[in-house]
Amino acid sequence: MSSNECFKCGRSGHWARECPTGGGRGRGMRSRGRGFQFVSSSLPDICYRCGESGHLAKDCDLQEDACYNCGRGGHIAKDCKEPKREREQCCYNCGKPGHLARDCDHADEQKCYSCGEFGHIQKDCTKVKCYRCGETGHVAINCSKTSEVNCYRCGESGHLARECTIEATA
């Protein structure tokens, strides 16, 4: 993802805080190496060109992008001279305003990012998963499986940089 793309929807022309997809949750198209890709069918399609819901930019009649703050063309929201329009924060789970995901009444629709099951979120998950071996029931620090570790300081295997006896060069 480039630095001029929105972290919520992955589109350029605005920042995440001005994203027309709404409050805290984006579409999560890019996982940035963390293994998470969220796409919700419960959220309406919002055009990043005009900021209206019900269609995507590829189907928009506008020829140029509109500012998400004032709705006029010729500039983007971060450069808008109008006062910033406040957007109500929405639940990450259902997309509705007025509550946070942890307080959402739609708990049966919540999907855990760790185990993939519905009915709870990651912080409440009882099935911890080790990122080293991929097994459930323990975390990496308690993993009995040995893995080849490499030192970032000297490049040798078998130890970490904090255990390296080679002097660091600046």
Swiss-Prot record:
The modification N-acetylserine is found at residue 2. A zinc finger (CCHC-type) spans 4-21, 45-62, 65-82, 89-106, 110-127, 128-145, 149-166. The keyword Phosphoprotein applies. One of its GO terms (molecular function) is mRNA binding. Keywords: Acetylation, Cytoplasm, DNA-binding, Endoplasmic reticulum, Metal-binding, Methylation, Nucleus, Phosphoprotein, Repeat, Repressor, Transcription, Transcription regulation, Zinc, Zinc-finger. PROSITE patterns: ZF_CCHC (PS50158). Single-stranded DNA-binding protein that preferentially binds to the sterol regulatory element (SRE) sequence 5'-GTGCGGTG-3', and thereby mediates transcriptional repression. Has a role as transactivator of the Myc promoter. Binds single-stranded RNA in a sequence-specific manner. Binds G-rich elements in target mRNA coding sequences. Prevents G-quadruplex structure formation in vitro, suggesting a role in supporting translation by resolving stable structures on mRNAs. This is CCHC-type zinc finger nucleic acid binding protein. It comes from Bos taurus (Bovine). The gene is CNBP.
